[in-house]
Structure formats: structure tokens, C-alpha cells
Amino acid sequence: MFVYLRGTVVGHQSEGGHRCALILEVNGVGYRLLVTSHLLQQYPPRPEVVQIFTHLSIREDQMLLYGFASAAERDLFLRLIRVNGVGPQMALSLLDTLPLPELVQAIVSGNTRRLSRAPGVGHKTAERIALELKAALSAWRQEMGFTTASSGLPSEAVREELELTLLALGYSDREIAAALTAVGQTTTLPNNSDPEAWLREAIAWLSANT
């Protein structure tokens, strides 16, 4: 029904269970959109006009409008909620935990450990998501122009150690994923190099960009 809405953000709402809502005023009408906390941070209340992609969910007892930063993010959300046992809130939780290309990569590679970091996503659900979406997303990400994992990224063993260390230092999964991707694109370190060397570069990037 609605592909996107264009208007001004006039307010935020935070609810229990990691639920976040954004109030978007369009031609004098305020729309309440359920969004990720990341999108909430991206669009603070201010007079500039923004465009948010939407999905309208109609149930017997309610109508809910979901908001997304891009058409690709909305498309992945719709694919996720078609998986048995994955509802809209869990899909938003997955989108909030990892940047879109990283989330797609985790699904395609069957990395259930990374998927299980999203609040509410257990190991069995993560396995089901990977099993049902792996093939479709492998082709879809190429259509969307997402790059696959770079050979410059750390090996899985090194990455796991880095993620655990950076999580302990207080960084979020989304920040860690962005840092490792950025470092992997510029570093001369081998992918199986000493984790401490990767850690130094990752922290340097995070200090400059967060």
C-alpha cells in the first residue's frame, strides 16, 4: 500500500522489548513507524525532509507500519518474516544487530553464531533462517550490489577473538562489523595475523569513527 513516506521526523518513542517508533509528519498527518534503534539514531527530530521506506502489516486487531532506511532493508525484512518462527520484531532485531551487508553475509555463510547475537534469536531459529534464505540471498545480494566478504578480512578464528574482545570493551556488533570491514579494505595484515595487530587497527578505526 505504501512504498515510502516523505516528511519530517517530529518525535521518537521507545517501548519495552527493544521496540522503537518514529513519528513522521507527512502533509499534516503523523505516522507512527516501528523502526530499528539504528534508524532512530539516524533520523533525529528536525525540520529536514526525509524519505523512509515502509511496510504496512494488517492484522485482525491492528495495523502496524514499519519503517526502513532503504528498499533493500525492507526487502530483507519481508524475506525474514516469511521464515517460520520469525516475526516482525525478531526481523527488526536482526536488522538492528548487524549492518545489512554483514547480516546477509552471516545468513549466506550459515554463521549462526553471529545471527544468534540478535536479541530473541536462538540457535535453532538462526539455523532455520540460514537454511531457508541462504540460496535466495546469495543471488539477491549480487542484484543489490553488496560485495561479498573480502579476502582482506580476518580469518574466522581471528574474527571471533576480535569480536569477543571488542564486545567486552563495550562496542556493539554493528560498530565491530563496520570496523572490521573498513580495516579489511585498507590493511596489509594477513587474514590469519596475530589478533592483537588486528585489534590495534580496529580500535584505531573505532576511535576515529565512533
Swiss-Prot record:
Function noted in UniProt: The RuvA-RuvB-RuvC complex processes Holliday junction (HJ) DNA during genetic recombination and DNA repair, while the RuvA-RuvB complex plays an important role in the rescue of blocked DNA replication forks via replication fork reversal (RFR). RuvA specifically binds to HJ cruciform DNA, conferring on it an open structure. The RuvB hexamer acts as an ATP-dependent pump, pulling dsDNA into and through the RuvAB complex. HJ branch migration allows RuvC to scan DNA until it finds its consensus sequence, where it cleaves and resolves the cruciform DNA.
NCBIfam families in the record: ruvA (TIGR00084)
Biological process per Gene Ontology, one example term: DNA recombination
Taxonomy of the source species: Bacteria, Bacillati, Cyanobacteriota, Cyanophyceae, Acaryochloridales
Residue segments, region Domain II: 70-148
Broad class of the protein's primary localization: cytoplasm
The keyword RNA-binding appears for this protein: no
Stretch list, region Domain I: 1-69
Name of the protein described by the UniProt record: Holliday junction branch migration complex subunit RuvA
